[in-house]
Each structure stands twice: as C-alpha cells, then as structure tokens.
C-alpha cells in the first residue's frame, strides 16, 4: 500500500495505478490487493475498503483482482469480504486468524462462516510464521469438501511435505499457490498453479516467465529463473516483509512512500546489500 507518510489516514493512490499497470504489463495474471505486502494489518477499515475499490477501478477488468479480507475476527472478515464482493472483487484472499491461535475446529468455523457470507471464490492463506496458527492439510480438505467457494490455498509454511498433502486429499479440487518466492518451482512440481508473490512487485516479467515456462514444459528455463532470483528473494526477506520490497520500489523510483508503524525503515546495512543485489539482478541501474 502506497503511503505519503507513516501517519494514519494518509494512504494515497497517485502511484497505485502505475504500479498496477507495471504488473499487468509484466504479465502478472491477477492483482492481489491489501495482503501482507500491502500492510493490511495497519490500515483502517476505511483505508482497507478504499484501496480495494481503487485497485478494482485501476485494473479495469484486464486481470482478476483478489482482495485481502482476512481478520482475526470472523465478523470483521465477513464484513470486509462482503464489501469487497460488492465493490467488484473477483476473489478473496483470507489469512488464518492471527494472535488468538484458533484450533482446527475454530478454523473450520471461521472459514465456513466467511464462505457462507459471499459468493466470491476464496483462497485460504496459511502462514503460521506470522499468525501462530497452522491450517493443517486435513482441515483444508474438510473445508474444500464442504464449501464450494473455498477453492484455493496460499501455502507459506516453507514445508513441501505439508504443502503436498492438501493436493493429495482434495482430488484436484484445490488450487495451490506458493506463498514462498524461493519455492515456486518446487511447489509447481507437486501441482501448484502459481505464486502470490513479493518478488513480482519488482520483477513481474521474471516471475511470469518462470511460471509460464514451467507450465509449457520448459522446466530447465523455469529452474534457471528460480535459481537466479534466490539472492534477490533472500534480500527481499532480509527484514520482515514488506520493509525490503518497499525500499526496493522506492529505489526503483516508484515512490511508494514510507512504512506505517510498527514497521520501520530498513537498516542502512541491509538496504545497501539490497541495492547491490538489485543491480546484479538487473533491476537497478
């Protein structure tokens, strides 16, 4: 999310359309708005709604828009999801509840209530390193079996064995997305259909080319693109996301603004390393 300052109620849209156009021109197949990289946790409800509406407006139906509408409060997630659907979102990305550490029964209840509240297709998002909550494969399978609009899973455990199990348990009814930029090709090898990416913010063409190559059967090229990107991916996660990627975009002249507290600016040493890696990767002069 682009911000003029770190103060509340200071989200701006001047560069959002440019950023969206850059992604689409680079081959990105869908726009995900108000997710982790979009600093959704520090947006007010009004800002959250506004940035989703703006993304839908600027995308102009060229690609689908997936709105991040997760919350650790089921009622809030339902409200955000219904508002995003009304605004024209094509799908929803809903992270597991964070901090309150729901049980698997609680997760089934949470996602079931949200699924019942909207007709939008929903991608569940499992990132236990951030949430303190792990959406287990058996739980995913139960949700997919009982709710027809729970269609996808963004898997960010970094655990290939866990990522494989929902695919085995859902008989082709689940679209798996990598939530780890360093593991896209490995996850596609077990059936993932793509990635919801931080890396693509700075190199959409490379990410698209990697996925396209894999799906066309050119595994050698896909593997090459994945391995070439590993130093950049490491740099983009050298501090908590989205600190490095906002720094990277600002270095590239995108003027996406500062971070909102409690996130803070990248350390000088890590910023220097990031710039060096970006130059080596060919995305910074």
What are these regions (language model features)?
Residues 182-285:
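Structured C-terminal cap/extension of enzyme domains
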Residues 16, 48, 52, 77, ...:
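A general structural signal for well-ordered alpha-helical segments in protein cores
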